[in-house]
């Protein structure tokens, strides 16, 4: 059975939220690619649309949009997802995962593309800040 940690990014505020999904909610992500848009019901955002922006497997290998399927592939990278060079011209062979989500993926990164007030929809409103404003 699939189980994922989903990191939800709100581009309007710059905040991120984490949710654990399993069972039927996790099955909605299986077989989807980076860039696919789906309904936010799986992560508790019923009136929102989310887009898959990336992820990583249980060993920390990043998913890359330019690698097809769910396979692992060794790439000689000059930069980008999976490698940040420390000097100009540096290249390194890195193992990355394909763009399709399967059971080996541990974390999925998503971004909200349609909808507003993600914090309120997830029930993570800042109650302490509201109390401070009233005083």
Swiss-Prot record:
Q: Which cysteines in this chain are paired by disulphide bridges?
A: none
Q: Which InterPro entries match?
A: Ribosomal_eS6, Ribosomal_eS6_arc, Ribosomal_eS6_CS
Q: Does the keyword Ribosomal protein apply?
A: yes
The protein's name is Small ribosomal subunit protein eS6
Under PROSITE patterns, the record lists: RIBOSOMAL_S6E
MF terms in GO: structural constituent of ribosome
**Pfam families the UniProt entry points to:** Ribosomal_S6e
Q: Which UniProt keywords apply?
A: Ribonucleoprotein, Ribosomal protein
Family in the record = Belongs to the eukaryotic ribosomal protein eS6 family.
Cellular component annotations (GO), alphabetically ordered: ribonucleoprotein complex; ribosome
Which organism is this entry from? Answer: Halorubrum lacusprofundi (strain ATCC 49239 / DSM 5036 / JCM 8891 / ACAM 34)
GO process annotations (BP): translation
Q: Which residues form the signal peptide?
A: none
């Amino acid at each position: 059975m699939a189980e994922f940690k989903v990191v939800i990014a709100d581009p309007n505020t710059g905040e991120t939220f984490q949710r654990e999904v399993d069972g039927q909610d996790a099955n909605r992500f299986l077989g989807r690619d980076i860039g696919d848009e789906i309904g936010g019901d799986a992560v508790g955002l019923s009136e929102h649309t989310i887009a898959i922006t990336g992820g990583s497997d249980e060993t920390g290998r990043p998913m890359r949009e330019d690698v097809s399927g769910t396979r692992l592939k060794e790439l000689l990278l000059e930069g980008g997802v999976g490698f940040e060079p420390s000097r100009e011209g540096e290249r390194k062979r890195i193992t990355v995962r394909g763009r399709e989500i399967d059971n080996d993926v541990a974390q999925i990164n998503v971004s909200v593309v349609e909808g507003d007030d993600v914090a309120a929809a997830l029930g993570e409103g800042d109650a302490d800040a509201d109390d401070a404003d009233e005083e």
